[in-house]
């Protein structure tokens, strides 16, 4: 059985909150390894990658999002993040909504997905500012059955699963994203 949580002796930093004032959680996210993220995505019946505005500032995040799309993961791009994806030939299933609107759709039990084939069971988030994503993850945690996975460089306590806080080692963060993709 594969160990999920990040142990202190590993190359990954331990899970520490990026925003220490963000403490209103009854259960914190499990900090997970890249291979575990890949396995969760592979097991998902309806995965969705939601991309945020940080893609406009980080070309590598755009490249990773494109690779997720090439692996068959549909992308709901927030309005700003859709431009670099479309320029690379990616057709997001949604490209005009804000993260707030996407979150409202995902919470709606009658939502049939952006493609009309049913709601998503696993949603992965990439390219968001930590304080904005935190609020949306809290909402999804309390008002939906969706498995949420935060793969930004910030540990997100409101997600069900999250990368650990990687703000001090950008190259480790990129290598973790690549490891997820390599294992899909």
From Swiss-Prot:
* UniProt xrefs under Gene3D superfamilies: TPP-binding domain (3.40.50.1220)
Q: Which domain of life is it from?
A: Archaea
The record's listing under Pfam families reads: CO_dh
Q: Name one GO biological process term.
A: methanogenesis, from acetate
Its annotated function is as follows:
Part of a complex that catalyzes the reversible cleavage of acetyl-CoA, allowing autotrophic growth from CO(2). The alpha-epsilon subcomponent functions as a carbon monoxide dehydrogenase. The precise role of the epsilon subunit is unclear; it may have a stabilizing role within the alpha(2)epsilon(2) component and/or be involved in electron transfer to FAD during a potential FAD-mediated CO oxidation.
Complex and partners: Heterotetramer of two alpha and two epsilon subunits. The ACDS complex is made up of alpha, epsilon, beta, gamma and delta subunits with a probable stoichiometry of (alpha(2)epsilon(2))(4)-beta(8)-(gamma(1)delta(1))(8).
Q: Which HAMAP family match?
A: CdhB
Q: Report the family membership.
A: Belongs to the CdhB family.
Protein name (Swiss-Prot/TrEMBL): Acetyl-CoA decarbonylase/synthase complex subunit epsilon 1
